Amino acid sequence: MSEAIPAETDVQSLISDPDTPIIELKNVEVTFKARTGSLFRPNHVHAVQGVNMKIMPGKVLGIVGESGCGKSTTANVMCGLQVATKGKVFFMGKDVTKRSAAHRRHIGSVVSVVFQDPATALNPRMTVQDQLADPLRVHKIGTEGTRDKRVRELLGLVGLPLSALNALPGQLSGGQRQRVAIARALSLHPKAIIADEPTSALDVSVRAQILNLLSDLKKELGLAMVFISHDIQTVRYISDRIAVMNAGKVVEEGDADTLLNHPSDPYTRKLLGAAPSLLHPQLD
């Protein structure tokens, strides 16, 4: 049986300890049944193999790799959207591999997710006001008045005007929609955000703005973050540490500057030698 997760007061004290990971994966594997094969001899896809990772308080872990390398599946295990086939998942040092509904609710209030495409992450029929207030209502936080105040605070945090409150997602630009998605992720005062390709669906001119916003929020709020991208130069821009994934495995992990200036794995060198990001036309 999994250990009880910490109470809210315990969570706050543990998060203040820079040596206690918010989320930790130990030897995690995720296997899916493939559509090929037969009923009696099904084929399996090993999406994640033996992954070890930590989300540390106030730090940004970048996960980089090509499409299909397992980075998004790994992130889904971290936030509870995917169950690990093997291995262990820890939340504040407690084993939550077999998560109950209470586990998921509690972790969801501490770790939020920003998805790749804000157009699909937001309800097209809900105004920005309702999108941002909804998590507070679901978790029964505050009164209508305090929720309205929090919604306005969130707009300010992500640089949107109050005039956006009554807008529907379809009336906003891609960059504005992603700002709303980020604001929604911040609504419950999380201590960590998992950002899964948060700039890849945006125009090049908007990507730097969103990256700068995430970087500013990390500093202002003391957020931990997992930043996922196929572009190693974009990951470099925001990360303290970087994990490079290939074929479901972490092939290299380390301090961002050290890993990028002195890569030890051929796959990392391949990523660095690929076409440079438009955000960084020249490598150091």
Please give the residue ranges for each predicted region.
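Conserved catalytic motifs of ABC-family nucleotide-binding domains
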Residues: 189
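Conserved ABC ATPase signature
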Residues: 168-172, 176
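The feature captures the beta-strand-to-loop junction immediately N-terminal to the Walker
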Residues: 64-66
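Conserved ABC transporter NBD signature motif
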Residues: 87-95, 107
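Helix-to-loop junction immediately C-terminal to a conserved catalytic motif
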Residues: 79
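Conserved ABC ATPase "signature" region
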Residues: 95, 146-163, 272-273
